């Protein structure tokens, strides 16, 4: 490993210790490399504004940073174990190509605010993706709720048959859930949309850095004012972003659970498209719902990443090397979470209900609640009506149909009044 930015003259570096210190940073930093380049360009512009760099030096740095970004995208430059991290790789390349101008670019900044700003830009992009995917899922669910509003579906509590429900209600539930997930991701985006560049190692520097310029140039909504809070927010903002992702993957886990049950032979309510199943290596008859099972497992990875960062934050104020581990947590957590969410809209759009199986699962007892409420409307005290309906639940469905039960469910949000216009207005507000 070469290009250790912190190495002191005459002090040898133990290779094993350095390998331990670096960990898998350089591999993880591939996620942040282009963001670090963008922030380096903005920082160089700010240095020129205060006289640290000449216009000529700024021009050379900007050109070389653009070339490095292009080389990285094309594979001509590989961020590998020759470098400690992305920051040292950028500085080494600039110094190699430009000499003193490359050695000047780190003036007024630390690797601490360098990774803070790169991570902040990365998180903004990831949160936008969470919001976009949640919005896509909500759109599929809204459209299907409209189209299948009157399709009877057995409603369950405790995984036991409970009341007559509808496909419209099932879809509307997921639509509202993912609208909220998009809102939460957007709100978290606003939290992290603050510029830490220029806070250095957490105590500022003796230079009049043009932080207003870097804030505008990098597209941040505001400046993160306090250098100490900039360091305190490392991990805190990552935790908030994982919580926003986790809201979506938590709902993903529950919808995957529903589909795991509904596609089983014991329920057979839903036909899963063949491309979302796999086979068994020994049982020729099997079509396994591996995709939805791994979707169901995804939230565990996101929750684990969140827990890792939460435990890392048992620290006093100021920078601590422990925080290096937060990078792996967010990279792995978002990789798993977004990969699963990417598949969800198409999966939901292609599910097929089996109306005959749905109707067959609606038994007489599922009308007992209707009977009790109707008696209460007629003047019978509800508790007495409840007891009478419970005693006669086996015959509660006599002369009744699922469609009539759904038509009578007029409370706002229930089967006869899904209020999809309200949900669609909330969805449109996300656009």
From Swiss-Prot:
Main location: cytoplasm
Keyword Cytoplasm tagged: yes
Keyword Cytoplasm: yes
Entry-linked PROSITE patterns: FUMARATE_LYASES
Keywords: Amino-acid biosynthesis, Arginine biosynthesis, Cytoplasm, Lyase
Recorded GO CC terms: cytosol
Enzyme class: lyase
Single Gene Ontology BP annotation: L-arginine biosynthetic process
Superkingdom of origin: Bacteria
Family stated for the protein in its record: Belongs to the lyase 1 family. Argininosuccinate lyase subfamily.
Full protein name: Argininosuccinate lyase
Pfam families in the cross-refs: Lyase_1
Pathway: Amino-acid biosynthesis; L-arginine biosynthesis; L-arginine from L-ornithine and carbamoyl phosphate: step 3/3
EC number of the protein: 4.3.2.1
Underlying gene: argH
Recorded catalytic activity of this chain's protein: 2-(N(omega)-L-arginino)succinate = fumarate + L-arginine
HAMAP family: Arg_succ_lyase
Signal peptide residue numbers: none
Molecular function terms from GO: argininosuccinate lyase activity
PANTHER family found in the cross-reference section: ARGININOSUCCINATE LYASE (PTHR43814:SF1)
Cysteine pairings via disulfide bonds: none
InterPro entries (alphabetical): Argininosuccinate_lyase, Fumarase/histidase_N, Fumarate_lyase_CS, Fumarate_lyase_fam, Fumarate_lyase_N, L-Aspartase-like
Subcellular localization: Cytoplasm
Organism of this sequence: Xanthomonas campestris pv. campestris (strain B100)
